[in-house]
UniProtKB/Swiss-Prot annotation:
This is Transcription factor bHLH55. Residues 74-126 form the bHLH domain. The gene is BHLH55. Transmembrane segments: none annotated. GO terms for cellular component: nucleus. Gene3D superfamilies: Helix-loop-helix DNA-binding domain. The keyword Glycoprotein does not apply. GO terms for molecular function: DNA binding; DNA-binding transcription factor activity; protein dimerization activity.
Length: 257
């Protein structure tokens, strides 16, 4: 079988050069993919106008987003910490308050509100006691600085009854109540110089007297001793019996010389 000559199928390159195939070639669209870095991921958002053109591109890092979310959490954490510290301080202060209050004020009361109320009552009671003690102190000062006419009369009568005789051993004693408890006035001659110490020893032995003041006055014929003493609560003092004891001990001291 005879084939035609291959030269018959040779393309005419000169004619081919006149043809334009560029319109038949469709350019390939390449989409570039860039994997974001894990350490700093990026979120892209594009705003599109009405004409379809891209308006702007906003870039926000994930760390900024997380920071904005953490701000309320940080505020809540700070608030909780401050509240915890405040509660601890209040608890410690209430413990100190319970320690300072006497037991009779907080007996049977456990709530903090009751403790605060009893603390107010305790302060009022202390103020009342301070006022009473101050008034009592002022009365004692006035009685010592400005003695009453009755006291002056008693002292004068005792002084007049004091003998000037060398051999006389009598002692005049007056026991009477006063503002603070008991007042003892002893008048004696010059021979009874140790009378005051004897009376003080006697009062100390009784164990129910608390001596507050002692004033000794020297006269021409002897001495006048004025003793102010407190008496313990619940103890009854018999003035006549105490007067006899003082006279007896004063007389015995002079006799034994």
């Amino acid at each position: 079988m005879n084939f035609p000559d291959s030269s018959l199928f040779t393309p005419n390159f000169a004619y081919e050069n006149d043809l334009d195939f560029s319109s038949l070639i469709t350019p390939s669209t390449r989409v570039s993919f860039q994997e974001p870095k894990p350490c700093n991921p990026v979120i892209h958002s594009a705003g599109i106008e009405n004409d379809g053109r891209q308006n702007c591109e906003t870039t926000m890092t994930l760390s900024e987003i997380m920071k904005g979310d953490d701000e309320p959490k940080n505020k809540r954490a700070k608030h909780k910490e401050l509240e915890r510290q405040r509660r601890q301080e209040n608890t410690s202060l209430f413990k100190i308050l319970r320690y300072l209050l006497p037991s009779q004020y907080i007996k049977g009361k456990r709530s903090s509100a009751d403790h605060v109320l009893e603390a107010v009552n305790y302060i009022k009671d202390l103020q009342k006691k301070i006022k009473e003690v101050s008034e009592k102190r002022d009365r004692i000062k006035r009685s010592i600085t400005h003695p009453s006419s009755r006291g002056e009369f008693s002292i004068r009568s005792l002084a007049s009854s004091t003998c000037s005789c060398v051999g006389d051993t009598n002692i005049a004693v007056v026991v009477r109540p006063c503002l603070i408890g008991l007042e003892i006035v002893v008048s004696c001659c010059n021979r009874h110089e140790s009378c005051l110490s004897s009376v003080l020893q006697l009062l100390a032995q009784e164990q129910c007297f608390n001596i507050v003041s002692c004033i000794s006055t020297r006269l021409h014929q002897g001495f006048i001793h004025t003793i102010a003493s407190e008496v313990e609560e619940g103890i009854e003092v018999y003035f006549s019996e105490l007067q006899e004891k003082i006279i007896k001990i004063g007389t015995s001291r002079v006799t034994t010389r």
